[in-house]
Amino acid sequence: MKKMKSFLGLLLLVFLFSSCESGKNTAKDNSNIEKLEYKESMEKYNYDIVIPQIKGVENEDISYLNLSLQESARILIENIMGSADAGTKEAPVEAKMSYEIKENNFNILSIVVTTYTYQGGAHGITSIESYNINRKDYSLLNYDMIFDENAEDYFNMRMNDIITASRENNGSRKALNTDGKEVLFFDNAESNVKNTVMYFDGDNVVFLYPHYEIAPYSSGMPVFKFDKKDIKKYVKIKF
């Protein structure tokens, strides 16, 4: 009888262990973001590039994303090395690429990639890209996959209201840039949500405008945030 109880107990442990192991087969549990780094410092040029690589997920979207980021890094390095003659010891040409994972409550993996290049002149150029990934199946998401046809008018109206209020109050912290500083917009600035970089941060969807899109370089890159509860009726997918 004792042997039978021991045997049944062993079977139960095996079953529980197997159940736990099977739970790890989901893409979400197995996913792991690793850093891929490229770095070199020479007299006339330097680059410091760090890109994310999503491991443990096998689907076309993630494979495409990983390879695309590698290709972007390769092209950036080639361009910097190719323009090395424009650099000097005092002011070498340079390239930097980094990324940030935005923690949020939308069940979306938001990766924001920032690229900076300097190839001579008064200042360098900073650009930002985002990659939004559904954590349920690890498919890449874009604006039209997430929001319905009425969302565009809503977002543009709200952003234009902020732009107008900011202009009338000479900034007055109505709109801020990525550094948390006030934005002074162009006189003819008009919002277009389709021209923004979109990512998810906390309880907000964030729309970021690149340099010169609606504000001068000195004002940085304006950001507009919309709370999850305010945009719920425009969302097509379940978070």
Explain the meaning of each model-derived region.
Residues 1-8:
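Bacterial N-terminal signal peptides that target proteins for export
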